[in-house]
């Protein structure tokens, strides 16, 4: 297959992400509400699970990138002692209040538990990996079909110094570790694998695959746990996924935005009040949604219009 990774975003009509095509597979109506190519409506309040995940991601980004940079500046031999010292030094400079400000009390406990227990893992990683970038935006232009573009953000790109290979980290905070069967078909991991093959080739290095870095959201050391899975799909799996994604992308482009009628999907959906009001009717504009739904307790609007900026690439 031909891939295009221009540094400048193409003017593709249809823009997708792993999350968006996953949403479409669950419920095409939900994708219609959320997609920035369509209604671009978001719930105004972030869920607690999203808030803690965002805070942990930001903390990991700061710790990994700053400690790795410090080690390189000092021409470190990357011994565990030097890596631990660098991590401790960076940790001492960080004001955690900036990460905690958006969290409720329970999630503050979870955040503190994670940062206390995961800190040693950062030092261990830095003995093997050099951090090349965190929160790295990418895009796949005219892929998997012409006039469609997939975009995303790699949590962390590292160089495995021993293997001389590129690896991508995907950090996940979770209540329970994901079953292996889910990861086998994970849309996000497959898309990252596609990008990783070309990224590593451009760097004239081997592609080492992806590291799914799962961190349990425990409030105490007893509830905390950490688990990793390594993924590098075969060429056959790579091609099979490409054909699957092509079919799903074409279906999404031609969708009539039907509701899913799935119990658990509807129960957990932020957009349930909209469907409850409109039924099978498809609202035509974001204005009628933003203006129509107000929280009875707070008096605040429940949804906001969140269009894509013209130069956005993430």
Regions found by a protein language model. Name each.
Residues 6-13, 29-42, 94, 168, ...:
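Short amphipathic alpha-helical segments and their helix-coil junctions
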Residues 16, 51-55, 110, 184-187, ...:
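Generic recognition of stable, solvent-exposed alpha-helical segments in well-folded globular domains
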Residues 58-137:
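A non-catalytic, helix-rich entry segment at domain boundaries
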Residues 25-36, 72-96, 209-225:
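Short, compositionally biased low-complexity segments
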Residues 1-26:
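Terminal, charged accessory segments of proteins
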Residues 1-3, 147, 162, 235-314:
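Accessory terminal regions of nucleic-acid processing enzymes
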Residues 130-247:
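Mg2+/Mn2+-dependent nuclease catalytic core
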Residues 18-68, 108, 112, 135, ...:
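Nuclease catalytic cores
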């Amino acid at each position: 297959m031909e891939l295009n990774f221009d540094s400048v975003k193409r003017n593709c009509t249809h823009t997708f992400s792993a999350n968006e095509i996953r949403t479409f597979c669950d419920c095409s109506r939900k994708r219609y509400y959320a997609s920035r190519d369509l209604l671009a409506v978001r719930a105004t309040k972030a869920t607690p699970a999203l808030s803690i995940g965002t805070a942990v991601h930001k903390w990991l980004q700061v710790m990994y990138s700053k400690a790795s940079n410090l080690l390189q500046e000092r021409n470190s031999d990357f011994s565990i002692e030097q890596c631990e010292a660098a991590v401790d030094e960076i940790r001492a400079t960080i004001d955690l209040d900036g990460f905690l400000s958006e969290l409720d009390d329970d999630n503050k406990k979870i955040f503190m538990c994670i940062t206390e227990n995961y800190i040693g893992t950062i030092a261990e990683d830095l003995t093997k990996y050099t951090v090349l970038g965190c929160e790295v935006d990418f895009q796949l232009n005219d892929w998997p079909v012409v006039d469609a573009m997939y975009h995303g953000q790699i949590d962390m790109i590292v160089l495995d110094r021993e293997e001389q290979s590129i690896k991508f980290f995907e950090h996940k905070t979770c209540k329970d570790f994901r079953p292996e069967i889910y990861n086998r078909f994970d849309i996000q991991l497959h898309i990252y694998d596609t990008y990783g093959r070309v990224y590593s080739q451009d760097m004239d290095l081997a592609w080492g695959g992806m590291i799914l870095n799962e961190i349990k959201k425990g409030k105490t050391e007893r509830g905390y746990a950490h688990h990793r899975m390594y993924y590098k799909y075969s060429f056959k799996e790579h091609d099979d996924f490409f054909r699957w994604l092509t079919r799903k992308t074409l279906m999404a482009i031609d969708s009539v935005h039907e509701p899913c009628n799935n119990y658990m999907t509807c129960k957990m959906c932020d957009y349930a009040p909209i469907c409850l009001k409109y039924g099978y009717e498809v609202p035509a504009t974001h204005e009628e949604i933003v203006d129509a739904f107000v929280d009875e307790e707070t008096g605040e609007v429940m949804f906001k219009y969140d269009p894509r900026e013209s130069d956005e690439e993430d």
